Structure formats: structure tokens, C-alpha cells
Amino acid sequence: MTDAAGGRQEIWVEKYRPERLEDVVGHPDITERLQSYVDRDDLPHLLFAGPAGTGKTASSVSIAKELYGDDWQDNFLELNASDERGIDVVRDRIKDFARSSFGGHNYRVIFLDEADALTDDAQSALRRTMEQFSNNTRFILSCNYSSKIIDPIQSRCAVFRFAQLGDDAVAAHLREIAETEGLEHTDDGIDALVYAADGDMRRAINALQAASATGDSVNEETVYAITATARPEEIETMVTEALGGDFAAARATLDDLLTNRGLAGGDIIDQVHRSVWEFDVEEAAAVRLLDRLGEADYRIAEGANERVQLEALLASVALNAE
């Protein structure tokens, strides 16, 4: 848990990053296909699409480690398109890396994370660069939404879609880490971590490490406190109150979450959205709720006041209560 040389605590996301494709959690079908490329040393350009924390970066780094061994860092360039947007990164950094010496390997790998953040011009330049250096460079592009990648790039890549990780896979991995670290934990603590992470393994591991820093057992109360996440029953209570026509009670619950608990409006919307079909409500009520939820989410994204939009959401639901 602690770096002996520097006395600093290691980041568990890095400490437990998979070393091999077979260690990547939750996507055996994908890793098996990727392993066949590595075993043949015949890697095509790859496009990894899916939500954050599902194994896209872990798979890319594992590929490099298996292909290049101890030399993997010299033959693997990782760039984040959201940090380095525009045409310059495509023309300069990628080209400089692709043109440099190879150290005995047939090709090198460039990993471009959040490639869907690149402008259309940058993607067009990237497509030309992929063609220019295809004999000695392989590209792995990672994105949340493949629809934001231009067709000429998609047609040059083998596309792999990483689905959100299942709760069981996340829970099992968290228990392995907790046992390795000698960390006391409860079942409800692991369940809370899984709920807060919502399929994002990176978020789950970071939350586990943050919870461990309290020095106490990792339990439900600790997890919800350090992740600023509402308990599922709190979300259900707020929505049920509004659906029952009790706007004042629903607003009081919302106020507690926003003011006393410090939750962001967008996080509350996300939690309501993922839980709506688990509520004991009629389908028509759930549909109305989703319709208003979409409006509130859009307006908040456009810069509207979070509290006003969430209160308007609850008011609309309460007014339509049967």
C-alpha cells in the first residue's frame, strides 16, 4: 500500500492494472480475440468503444506489455485527445513517434484515448497519418461513442465494443484487492462501492482506496460518505414522494442531498435515471418521469441552475400525480 522508498501511498488503479490480457476483468470474448492478434504478432488498427472504466486502456497497455516485454514503454505512445485537441497533435507528436527508431520490432503502437474528442479536421489528419505509417505503426483508438469517429477511420480498424462491467465482476475484483491489502470490509460496503461505481472499475478501485484511508472497516456508511453518492433508498424516497403528489417532502429530500450531502445535480439525475425501472411505480408514471428527467438533464448541460431544474422536475411529477 505504501511505497517503501518514498513513503508514499501507491495509487491502486496503477498497482492493480492488468499485466496481461487474460487479467482484464469482464470481457473474456474481447480479450481472447485480442490475444490471438498478440500471439501472431499481427496487430491491426483497433478501435475500442465503450463507457469509462471498462478496460479499454487496460487492454491497450496489456497488448503493449505482451508484445514488447520490458521495452513496452519505448514502443508505446499514449496520448489523450481531450487534453491535446486539434490538428497539431496528429501532425507532430504522432508523426515524430512513428518516424523514430524501432529497436528491433516490426511496428510500434500509438494509443489515442478519448479519440472522439478530436475535431473532424484532426480525425481526417489522423486517417492520413494512419495510412502513411501503416507499415510500421499500429493505432489503438479509444472512445466513449464510436458514432463520433468518422467512417474512414472506423473502416480501417477492428472495432471492439466494451460493455459496462457487470456488478458481479466489479464486486469480485474489489474483494480480491481488499483481501490482498488486508482491508476489513463488509458485504454492504462492497455492494455500495459497486452501486457508486456504476460499472466503472477505475472509479470503484479509487473509491475503495479512499474508503480504506479512513482506517475503519469499509462499510456502506463510509462508502456513501466518501463517494458523495445518495443511497438508492434515498433516491426512491424522493421520487416516490413526488409521484405521490407530496412536493414539499420530495423537495426536502432533494435539499438534503444537495445542501447537506453536497451531491451535484447531474449525479442525482444519473441516479434517478438508472433506478427508475426499479421503483414500484406504474409504467405511465415512469415514462412521464423519464420525459421530465431528459428535459432537466439537457437544461443543466446547457448551463441552467441545477436546483431550479431539479425542483421543477419534482414539481412537474407531483402535479401530474394521480
UniProtKB/Swiss-Prot annotation:
One of its GO terms (cellular component) is DNA replication factor C complex. Keywords: ATP-binding, DNA replication, Nucleotide-binding. CDD domains: AAA, HLD_clamp_RFC. SMART domains: AAA (SM00382). GO terms for molecular function: ATP binding; ATP hydrolysis activity; DNA binding; DNA clamp loader activity. InterPro entries: AAA+_ATPase, ATPase_AAA_core, DNA_pol3_clamp-load_cplx_C, DNA_Rep/Repair_Clamp_Loader, P-loop_NTPase, Rep_factor-C_ssu_arc, Rep_factorC_C, RFC_lid. It holds the Pfam family Rep_fac_C. Coiled coil: none annotated. Transmembrane segments: none annotated. ATP binds at G50, P51, A52, G53, T54, G55, K56, T57. GO terms for biological process: DNA repair; DNA-templated DNA replication. Part of the RFC clamp loader complex which loads the PCNA sliding clamp onto DNA. Heteromultimer composed of small subunits (RfcS) and large subunits (RfcL). Belongs to the activator 1 small subunits family. RfcS subfamily. HAMAP family: RfcS. This is Replication factor C small subunit. It comes from Halobacterium salinarum (strain ATCC 700922 / JCM 11081 / NRC-1) (Halobacterium halobium). The lineage of its organism: Archaea, Methanobacteriati, Methanobacteriota, Stenosarchaea group, Halobacteria.
